[in-house]
């Protein structure tokens, strides 16, 4: 009975992810933090299912910006109608246009940049757990997961705003990636889709050479994947 009462008291947070698979990985990491903080968490609900919604936006190209703004406005309307207590927005769009969005859409309780997860947890009155940095609540089918190996990009393509939003290319240390792979394998993952803004550039900043082949080789050398 006491367990049931505690579950009834737990608030639900809806995470809405727009854009690419790299954004999805960010959402999965945030979901794990929120679950650890004691929330029930849903993903990509079409209508608010909980008291709080967090929209993880995309600002890659014009169509992505439009989709993100429309989603924010849709959930802002839900809040005005009393279907939401709190509405938060994070991700690439708010990283680039935070001040402008805050002025234009005041229904949003707070806008965060792409990497401000700790601040979001703090504003909810919860602690951010650094020890969970490789853990995620997977939204993909149980047999596979995305594996993000870097952030940012050093290229300056005229159509793309990613370097402006996320900054220069930053590779994750190989040891950290392998630790995440081991964790995901322990959860039953058998297939990894390696992702980054510029995959072939992995390692140039850390190891002074392209290291994607070595990363894949080391993964297979040191890991026993389930059959």
Residue spans for each PLM region:
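Short, Lys/Arg-enriched N-terminal segments with co-localized hydrophobic residues
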Residues: 1-7
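Proteins enriched for Cys/Gly/acidic motifs involved in redox and nucleic-acid/cofactor modification
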Residues: 8-202, 211, 217
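Active-site core of PLP-dependent enzymes with the aminotransferase class I/II
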Residues: 205
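Conserved small/polar residues in nucleotide/adenosyl-binding loops
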Residues: 221-227
């Amino acid at each position: 009975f006491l367990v049931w009462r505690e579950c009834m008291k737990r608030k639900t947070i809806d995470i809405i992810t727009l854009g690419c698979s790299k954004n999805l990985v960010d959402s999965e990491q945030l979901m794990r933090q929120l679950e650890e903080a004691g929330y029930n968490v849903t993903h990509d609900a079409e209508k608010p299912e909980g008291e709080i919604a967090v929209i993880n936006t995309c600002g890659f190209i014009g169509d992505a910006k439009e989709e993100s703004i429309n989603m924010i406005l849709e959930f802002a309307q839900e809040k005005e109608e009393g279907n939401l207590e709190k509405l938060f927005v994070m991700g690439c769009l708010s990283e680039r246009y935070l001040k402008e969005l805050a002025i234009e859409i005041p229904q949003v309780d707070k806008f965060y940049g792409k990497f401000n997860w700790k601040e979001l947890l703090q504003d909810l009155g919860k602690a951010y757990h650094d020890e969970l940095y490789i853990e995620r609540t997977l939204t993909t089918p149980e047999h596979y997961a995305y594996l993000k190996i870097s952030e940012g990009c050093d290229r300056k393509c005229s159509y793309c705003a990613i370097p402006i939003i996320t900054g220069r290319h930053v590779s994750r240390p190989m040891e950290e990636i392998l630790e995440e792979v081991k964790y995901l394998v322990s959860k039953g993952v058998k297939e990894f889709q390696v992702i980054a803004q510029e995959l072939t550039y992995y390692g140039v900043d850390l190891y002074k050479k392209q290291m994607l082949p070595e990363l894949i080789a080391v993964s297979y050398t040191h890991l026993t994947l389930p059959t």
